[in-house]
C-alpha cells in the first residue's frame, strides 16, 4: 500500500506537469526551474546534470570546487535605483506550501523563489555547478562521500508564529538544518513518499559542525553530487518552536504553518489570498546579495487567473509583465502588434533586438525541457511484438499532430532525453509516417483482415484497444483523435476513454490500461533507471512494463559512469534500443512560448530559457 501511495503521488506530479505544458501555461521562469530541478530530492522529479566540470572534482579526493564566488553574478545588472514589481499569473491555487509534503507544481514554483539549495547550475553552461549556499565541496574518488562547507551568516527569514502571534527574528542557517530536512523526509510517518524514494541510496548525513556537512551515498552513482547539491535546509525553529520534539503527524496536517514559507532564499512570501494571489517581497538579508546574485526587483505578484484568454487580456492591458502563451495564442495573436516581430531565442539578449515603434511586448521562444508520448502496456499481447509497435508509430501522423495540435510550435522526437543536450542522439531520426510500410509490418506479425469486416485480426482476436485520456484536456483529445483516425484507416480500432485524474492515476498505478498518453519533464541529463529499468515495472515509473536485458545493462552502466563522454555514448546506445523497440510512440517536444513587457531589462535567453531574477525594470 505504501508503494502504491508513493506512485499515486508521483503520477499526480507527472500529470500535473504534463497538463501545465499541454495548456501552454508557463508557471515559472528558467531560474525558478533551475532551482526546482536541481533540488531533485525535494521535488520528486529528475534534476540537473553532472558534467565534465563536476567529474574533475570527483576524480581526485583533494580537488575542490570554486570557492566563494558564483560566476552567475555576471548576468545580474543593477540599475541605479532598484525596485519595481514583476506581475505574473498562474492558472490555479495550491494546497500546502510545506517544502517536504507540498508536491503541486504551483507550490513548487513559489517555494523555489523563497528557499535555496547548496549549489546551482551555471546559467550559460547548465552542465556545470556553481556554489550557492555551499562555499565549497570535496568529493571522494568513488563519488560516495561528499564534504560540504557552508557559507557563513546565511539567515532564515523572520516570521510571526501563526499560533502565538510572536515575532521570531532571523536565525542563522546551519548544517543541522540540512540534516533535519533529510530526517524529516525519511520519517515514514511524514507524507513524503515520492520524495523519500530519492533517499533510498543515501547512507548517512551528519553535521560535522555548524558549517560543515558530510553526505555519504551507498553506491557509486554519477548523480550523487547533483543530489547532494540539491539539498535544502528545513527550519526546525519554525516547525518545532521552543525546541519541541518533532511531531510527524502534526507536520503533515499543520494547516497554519503549511500556509506559510520560512526560507532563506531571494524572496519572502508576505501575503497569500486564497484563489486570488501570492505576494513575494525581496528578502533584504538574502545571502545572495553578498555574491551579487540578488534580484533587483523588489516584489513579485502572482495572480491566480484560471482562464487563459483572461490572462492574455491582462497582458495586453499591461496588467501583467510576463505570460506563457499557448501555441494557438502565439500564432493567432502574437504575430501582431503590440507583440514584437522579432523573437528572442536561446543564446540571444533583448538588448540585441530592441523593440520597434508600436511594440510593447517581447516574444521569447525556446524548446521546453519536456516531451510527450503515447505509451503501450507491454503486458498486453497486442503490443508484445516490436513489429506491431513500430507499425503503430508509423501509423501515427506526428507531423499532422505537430501542425494541427501544437500549431508547428515544437519538434517531433525519437527518444527520451532532453533534445538540446548532448545525451539526445539527433542522428536517430523519428520513424516516418508510412501507412504502407506499417501494414507490411503488421502482416509480417500475423495481423490481417481475414473476415473482411475492416478490422485486423490474428488467431481470432480483433485489433481493438482503449487509450486513456485525461478528461478536459483538449490537447490530448485532439492528438488521440488524430491517432484514432490514422489507425482506423489501417484496420485498427482504438477507443478513447476520458477519465478524471484520480481514476487515470489509479489505472496507471495498477497497470490497468492498454494505451496512455502522457509527458515527462526533463533536465539536460536524466537517469533512465526510474522510467525504463525492468526492476521499476512492478511499482516504479516504468508503468508500461518495458523489459530489455541489454537496456538494463546500459542503464546500470550509465549510473556508474562518471566520465561525461562515456555516459553520452551509453545514452546514445540506449536511445537506439528504444528506437528499435518503440515501447513509446515518442511525440513532440513543445516550444516554450512567452511574452514579456517591454519595460523589463536585462532579458537574456539561456539554454534553459529566461532567468527572471536577472530582470530589472527600466526607469
Residues covered by each model-derived region:
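N-terminal lobe/hinge region of extracytoplasmic solute-binding protein
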Residues: 71-74, 84-141, 183, 262-264
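Detector for C-terminal structural segments
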Residues: 18-28, 33, 37, 69-70, ...
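Gly/Pro-rich hinge or "lid" segments in bacterial periplasmic/extracellular proteins
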Residues: 116, 122-124, 229-295, 299-301, ...
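Ligand/substrate-recognition segments at binding pockets and active sites
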Residues: 88, 274-275, 293, 299, ...
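Alpha-helical secondary-structure segments
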Residues: 174-177, 210, 214-216, 265-266, ...
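Surface-exposed binding/hinge segments that line
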Residues: 190-245, 268
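Aromatic- and charge-enriched surface segment that lines or borders ligand/interaction sites
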Residues: 135-190, 214, 311-314, 382
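Ligand-site clamp/hinge motif
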Residues: 252-258, 285-348, 484, 493-495, ...
Amino acid at each position: 500500500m505504501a508503494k502504491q501511495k508513493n506512485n499515486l503521488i508521483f503520477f499526480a506530479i507527472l500529470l500535473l506537469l504534463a497538463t501545465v505544458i499541454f495548456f501552454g501555461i508557463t508557471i515559472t521562469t528558467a531560474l525558478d526551474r533551475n532551482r526546482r530541478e536541481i533540488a531533485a530530492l525535494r521535488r520528486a522529479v529528475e534534476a540537473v546534470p553532472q558534467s565534465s566540470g563536476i567529474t574533475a572534482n570527483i576524480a581526485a579526493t583533494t580537488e575542490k570546487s570554486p570557492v566563494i564566488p558564483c560566476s552567475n553574478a555576471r548576468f545580474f545588472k543593477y540599475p541605479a535605483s532598484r525596485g519595481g514589481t514583476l506581475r505574473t499569473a498562474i492558472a490555479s491555487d495550491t494546497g500546502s506550501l510545506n517544502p517536504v509534503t507540498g508536491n503541486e507544481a504551483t507550490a513548487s514554483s513559489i517555494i523555489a523563489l523563497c528557499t535555496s539549495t547548496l549549489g546551482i547550475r551555471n546559467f550559460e553552461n547548465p552542465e556545470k555547478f556553481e556554489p550557492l549556499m555551499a562555499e565549497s565541496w570535496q568529493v571522494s574518488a568513488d563519488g560516495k562521500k561528499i564534504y560540504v562547507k557552508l557559507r557563513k551568516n546565511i539567515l532564515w527569514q523572520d516570521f510571526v508564529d501563526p499560533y502565538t502571534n510572536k515575532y521570531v527574528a532571523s536565525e542563522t542557517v546551519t548544517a543541522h538544518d540540512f540534516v533535519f530536512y533529510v530526517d524529516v523526509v525519511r520519517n515514514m510517518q511524514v507524507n513524503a513518499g515520492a520524495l523519500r524514494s530519492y533517499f533510498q541510496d543515501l547512507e548517512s548525513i551528519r553535521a560535522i559542525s555548524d558549517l560543515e556537512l558530510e553526505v555519504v551515498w551507498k553506491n557509486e552513482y554519477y548523480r550523487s553530487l547533483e543530489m547532494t547539491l540539491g539539498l535544502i535546509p528545513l527550519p526546525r525553529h519554525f516547525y518545532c518552536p521552543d525546541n519541541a520534539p518533532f511531531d510527524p503527524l502534526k507536520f503533515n496536517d499543520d494547516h497554519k504553518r503549511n500556509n506559510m514559507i520560512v526560507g532563506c532564499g531571494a524572496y519572502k512570501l508576505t501575503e497569500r489570498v486564497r484563489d486570488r494571489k501570492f505576494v513575494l517581497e525581496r528578502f533584504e538579508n538574502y545571502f545572495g546579495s553578498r555574491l551579487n546574485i540578488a534580484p533587483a526587483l523588489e516584489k513579485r505578484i502572482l495572480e491566480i487567473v484560471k482562464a487563459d484568454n483572461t490572462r492574455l487580456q491582462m497582458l495586453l492591458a499591461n496588467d501583467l509583465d510576463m505570460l506563457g502563451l499557448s501555441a494557438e495564442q502565439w500564432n493567432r495573436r502574437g504575430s501582431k502588434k503590440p507583440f514584437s516581430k522579432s523573437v528572442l531565442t536561446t543564446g540571444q539578449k533583448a538588448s540585441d533586438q530592441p523593440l520597434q515603434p508600436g511594440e510593447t511586448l517581447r516574444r521569447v521562444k525556446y524548446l521546453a525541457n519536456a516531451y510527450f508520448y503515447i505509451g503501450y502496456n507491454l503486458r498486453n499481447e497486442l503490443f508484445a511484438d516490436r513489429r506491431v509497435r513500430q507499425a503503430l508509430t508509423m501509423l501515427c501522423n506526428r507531423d499532422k499532430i505537430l501542425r494541427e495540435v501544437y500549431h508547428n510550435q515544437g519538434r517531433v522526437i525519437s527518444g527520451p532525453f532532453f533534445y538540446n543536450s548532448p545525451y539526445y542522439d539527433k542522428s536517430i531520426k523519428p520513424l516516418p509516417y508510412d501507412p504502407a510500410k506499417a501494414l507490411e509490418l503488421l502482416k509480417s506479425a500475423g495481423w490481417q483482415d481475414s473476415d473482411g469486416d475492416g478490422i485486423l485480426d490474428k488467431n481470432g482476436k480483433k485489433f481493438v484497444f482503449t487509450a486513456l485520456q485525461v478528461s478536459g484536456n483538449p490537447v490530448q483529445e485532439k492528438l488521440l483523435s488524430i491517432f484514432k483516425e490514422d489507425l482506423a484507416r489501417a484496420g485498427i480500432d482504438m477507443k478513447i476513454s476520458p477519465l478524471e485524474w484520480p481514476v487515470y492515476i489509479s489505472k496507471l498505478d495498477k497497470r490497468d490500461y492498454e494505451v496512455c498518453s502522457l509527458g515527462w519533464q526533463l533536465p539536460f541529463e536524466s537517469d533512465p533507471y526510474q522510467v525504463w529499468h525492468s526492476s521499476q515495472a512492478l511499482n516504479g515509473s516504468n508503468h508500461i512494463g518495458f523489459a530489455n536485458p541489454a537496456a538494463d545493462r546500459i542503464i546500470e552502466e550509465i549510473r556508474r559512469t562518471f566520465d561525461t563522454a562515456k555516459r553520452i555514448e551509453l545514452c546514445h546506445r540506449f536511445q537506439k534500443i528504444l528506437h528499435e523497440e518503440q515501447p513509446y510512440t515518442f511525440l513532440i517536444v513543445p516550444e516554450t512560448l512567452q511574452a514579456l513587457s517591454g519595460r523589463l531589462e536585462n532579458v537574456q535567453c539561456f539554454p534553459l530559457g529566461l532567468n527572471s531574477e536577472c530582470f530589472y525594470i527600466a526607469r
